[in-house]
Amino acid sequence: GLWSKIKAAGKEAAKAAAKAAGKAALNAVSEAV
């Protein structure tokens, strides 16, 4: 139903946000070094 679609979208968004945060952290570290 609708709720499972919303939950799935939230999970995907969280995954994308985590990936973006990890990339940003790596960039910050490589620039700091």
Swiss-Prot record:
Entry keyword Oxidoreductase: no
Gene Ontology cellular component annotations, sorted alphabetically: extracellular region
Keywords in alphabetical order: Amidation, Amphibian defense peptide, Antibiotic, Antimicrobial, Secreted
Entry-annotated residues carrying Valine amide: V33
Compartments it resides in: Secreted
Top-rank lineage group of the source organism: Eukaryota
One BP annotation, GO: defense response to bacterium
Sequence similarity: Belongs to the frog skin active peptide (FSAP) family. Dermaseptin subfamily.
Function: Has antibacterial activity against the Gram-positive bacteria S.aureus and E.faecalis, and the Gram-negative bacteria P.aeruginosa and E.coli. Has antiprotozoal activity against T.cruzi. Has antifungal activity against the yeasts C.tropicalis (MIC=10.1 uM), C.guilliermondii (MIC=20.3 uM), C.albicans (MIC=20.3 uM) and C.albicans ATCC 1023 (MIC=10.1 uM). Decreases viability of murine peritoneal cells. Fuses to, and disrupts liposomes.
Record-given protein name: Dermaseptin-DI1
Species in which this protein is naturally found: Phyllomedusa distincta (Monkey frog)
